[in-house]
Amino acid sequence: MDDDLDQFFHDDAEQNADFSDDGSEDEAPDNVDVNYELEREEPKSKSVAEFTKFLQECEYPDDIIKYFKTIKFFEKDAKTGDIVSTKSLKFTVTGFIQYLFGTKRIQRPVLRGIAKIFGRYDIFHLISPELVKSITHLKETRTTAWFNLFNFLSFVPHPTDRVTKPLFRQFCVRTPFNDKSMKKRKLTWISTDYDNVWMAVMNGKISDKLTLKLIPYITQNVISKLKAPFKSADFFFKMFDKTDYHGILSLGAIFRLISEHNFEYPKFYDKVYSLTNPSLLYMSQKESILTLLDSFLSSTHLPTYITASFLKRLSRCLLLAPIDAQEPILGLIRNLVIRHPNCSELVHREVPQTLYDDPFDNDETDLHKTRALESSLWEMKLLQCHWNQSVRKRAHFVDKSIQKIESYVRFRCTDELFSVNMAKSFGGEDGEAEKYRKLQDGDEDEEGTGKPEPKKARRKGFGGKFAPKHEEKVTRAVGVNSEAPKGILDRQVPIIDVPTLWKI
C-alpha cells in the first residue's frame, strides 16, 4: 500500500527504487560505497530544544523531510562495529518526545501529518522506549500532553492493519533494520512496540477527560490486536468501578474479557443492572450498549429472577426513553420473553391495578430483592397509547400469543423517524414514503394489533361481464381568457401567411 509520505520524495523516487522493503533490502547498489555514509563526519544538527521549537514552527511535513536530508542518522561503533544511532538521531527522538508532551495542544490534522513520518515502523522502534518512560512519569493533570499522545497513537497503525514503509531507507543505505534477524522478526518487534506503548498508556495516570475517549477507542481498535489482551483487565475493571458513565463505556471490553478470556467479576449482572437507567438511553453509544445487553442476556441458563428484573427495569426506562430508543428496547423486551418462557407470567398477570400496588422495587440494586417476578409488564399497556404508530404496534405483542421466533431489533435515528412521520399525509392515507417503508419492513402483520381490517362489501350486480368497461365521461367547464393578446402576439398577420407566423 502506498504511503502518503511518498509525495515528498519525488526527486529520489527513481534512485530509491532499488531500496524497497523487499528481500533485496540488504543488498547495496552498484558504484555506491556502503561504508561511506557510516564513516563520514557527522554534520552539525539541531539540539533537542532547537528541534522541538522547529517542530512547533513547521507548517508542512516537507520541512521535516528537508531537515532529515541534512543530518546523519547512523554510524559504526568503533569498539563493536555495530551500526548505532548518532547524536543527531537521539536529539531528534528526544525533541519529538518533548514536542508531543509539551504544554501546547496540537491539532489532530497536524498530528496526522506528523504520524506519517514518526509513525513509520523503524523510527517508531526508537521512539517507543522513550515514550514508555515518559508515559510512566506523566501526571494526571497534564491533560494537554495526554490528548497529544492519544491523538498521535491513534494514527500509528498496527502491523495487522498495515505495515508502513521504512523511513531511514529514504536517506541512507545501511541501517540496523537491514540485519537479517531484524527483518525476519519484523512483525514481531513491531507488534511488541505497539503493545508496550498502549499498555503503558493503560497503566498510566490518565486524565479523567481522556478516559471518556480512550475507553471506546481501546475497546474497538486496540484490545483485539494486543498479544495478551488479558493484561488490559486491570485498566477496564478499574474504569468499570469508577463511575456509572465509565462503567457503561467499559461494558464491551469487560464482556470480551469474561467471555473470551474466562475472567470473573463478582456480581457482574448486579453491576450491569445498576447501570441500566434512563440516562443510558440518551447517550450516543446507546445502540452498542443495547446490543451488549442483548448479548449479556442471551444465555437461556440465566436465573429467571435476573431476566425478570431486567425486563422490569427496561420497561420502566421505556417510559422516559427518547423515541429513537423505544423501538429497539421493545424488540429487546419481546425477545427476552421469547428466550425465557418462565417470564411469560409477567405478560399474562392482571395485577397491579395501580402504580403504587406494583411490588417491583425499582430502586433495589440486589437482583434477589427486586420482586420482579411478582409484578407484570403493565408498562406495555401504557405504551399502546403512544403517539407514535410504530411504538403502539410493537407494544401490542403482550395481547397476542408468545411467538417462537425472535424479532429483529431495529435501530433508527431521529432524522429517519422524523422523515417517516413527515411523509404521512395528515388526516388521510399514508404517504408514498410510508407505504414504501412498510413494504421494506415486512413486519406489519407481526407487530399489528391482530385485528384485520374488514373487507369492503361488494355491491351485487357489478363485476364480471356486467362490470362497466369505461368510466362515464364528465364534462367540466374550462376558464377562457377574453382579453386581447399583448406584446409580440399583438400583430396583424393573415392566417394564410404561414411562413410569417413561423418567424414570429
Curated annotation (Swiss-Prot):
One Pfam family, please name it: CBF
Which biological process terms from the Gene Ontology are attached to this UniProt entry? ribosome biogenesis
Q: Which domain of life is it from?
A: Eukaryota
Q: Where is this region: Disordered?
A: 431-483
Q: Name one GO cellular component term.
A: nucleolus
Recorded family membership: Belongs to the CBF/MAK21 family.
Q: What is the protein name stated in its UniProt record?
A: Uncharacterized protein T20B12.3
* Provenance organism: Caenorhabditis elegans
